[in-house]
């Protein structure tokens, strides 16, 4: 029996322009059924426009949008098997919780007894089974967010689109809701497409992340792949904190930066090719200055609760960010040490296709 590998959502060469301003630039995107995807990027990068294009609220200027293999560019939003949870939830204050959840079903003239059954089931999914009669003004922000999700799920979509739904919540509730959303997606087994500018949310919840900037998808992959193997300077800086240092790839598995040669885990580049070297702050260990692979001088530090964030400089005036469980004195020279696999080498201006091909080539060797 053949396995259906066709993506549930596919965008092919999709662009969107407003006059001369191009919001989306040749977007190609495949979403498989049953996974949690995140579009991650700064404000104005085009991530919400992609969401609206899939939902049918925005028309693509060019390119094709597919759902289960069928082009849906001209299909009205209310006929698409997707539902959207908006940033402001868009709940009706004059309706109670159950009435809000039932609203879409009533518009579609679903029989009353079926409405009651589906509303109760949807509320139970989001742990609000006992709050159906509550007014919207009587429930918390986190509960309002769950009502908005229940209202979308009650329509039994194949894809749920979520447009920064956690942004209005406080830090603790936002973290709690990350767990709840991930658990809900896994229990339901439907496709979630989540939009956020918060890299912590993306890393915590996603099966796959697409990092965007200026209307383009720069890199897609698992959270671990995106974090450990960023394709370029923007991705490395946007996904977590990074030390990014100019360097030179001497040969496979050997790189030079700050005037020294180091063993690394990268290959597939030209001898003496100019590169950028990434070292994450948490991968740097502090040792005595005479024992370090690098020597830096501490400039400042902040206590972050479970670690000290130390800013230091080397003799070439490169800034180094270090996360350590031990404090360091300002003005003190310290040694930094790290393992070869902690070094990530990035080519300048490498496309995602070329990046993926290079990784596959040297990982297979």
From Swiss-Prot:
SMART domains: AAA. The keyword Transport applies. It catalyses: ATP + H2O + polyamine-[polyamine-binding protein]Side 1 = ADP + phosphate + polyamineSide 2 + [polyamine-binding protein]Side 1. It is an enzyme of class 7 (translocase). It comes from the Bacteria. Its EC number is 7.6.2.11. Keywords: ATP-binding, Cell membrane, Membrane, Nucleotide-binding, Translocase, Transport. The complex is composed of two ATP-binding proteins (PotA), two transmembrane proteins (PotB and PotC) and a solute-binding protein (PotD). This is Spermidine/putrescine import ATP-binding protein PotA. The lineage of its organism: Bacteria, Bacillati, Bacillota, Bacilli, Lactobacillales. The gene is potA.
């Amino acid at each position: 029996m053949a396995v259906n590998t066709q993506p549930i959502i596919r965008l092919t060469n999709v662009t969107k322009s407003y006059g001369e301003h191009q919001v989306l630039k040749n977007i190609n995107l495949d979403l498989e059924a049953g996974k949690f995807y995140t579009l991650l990027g700064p404000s104005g990068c085009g991530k919400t426009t992609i969401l609206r294009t899939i939902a049918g609220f925005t028309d693509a200027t060019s390119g094709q949008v597919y759902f289960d293999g069928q082009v849906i560019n001209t299909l009205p939003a209310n006929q698409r098997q997707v539902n959207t949870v908006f940033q402001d939830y868009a709940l009706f204050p004059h309706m109670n919780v159950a009435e809000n959840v039932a609203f879409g079903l009533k518009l579609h003239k679903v029989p009353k007894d079926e409405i009651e059954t589906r509303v109760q089931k949807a509320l139970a999914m989001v742990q609000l089974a006992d709050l159906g009669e509550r007014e919207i003004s009587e429930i918390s922000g986190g509960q309002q967010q769950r009502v908005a999700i229940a209202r979308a799920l009650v329509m039994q979509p194949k894809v749920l689109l979520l447009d920064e739904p956690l942004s209005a919540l406080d830090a603790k509730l936002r973290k709690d809701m990350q767990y709840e959303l991930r658990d809900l997606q896994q229990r339901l087994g439907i496709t979630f497409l989540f939009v956020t500018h918060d890299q912590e949310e993306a890393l915590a919840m996603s099966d796959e992340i697409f990092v965007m900037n200026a209307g383009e998808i720069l890199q897609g992959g698992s959270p671990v792949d995106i974090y450990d193997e960023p394709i370029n300077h923007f991705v490395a800086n946007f996904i977590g904190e990074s030390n990014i240092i100019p360097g030179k790839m001497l040969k496979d598995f050997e790189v030079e930066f700050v005037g020294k040669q180091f063993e690394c885990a990268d290959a597939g580049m030209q001898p003496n090719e100019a590169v950028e070297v990434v070292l994450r702050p948490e991968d740097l260990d502090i040792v005595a200055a005479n024992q370090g692979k690098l020597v830096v001088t501490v400039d400042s530090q902040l206590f972050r609760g479970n670690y000290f964030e130390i800013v230091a400089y080397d003799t070439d005036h490169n800034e180094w960010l270090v996360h350590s469980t031990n404090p360091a004195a300002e003005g003190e020279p310290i040694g930094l040490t790290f393992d070869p696999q902690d070094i990530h080498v990035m080519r300048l201006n490498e496309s995602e296709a070329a990046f993926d091909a290079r990784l596959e080539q040297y990982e297979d060797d």
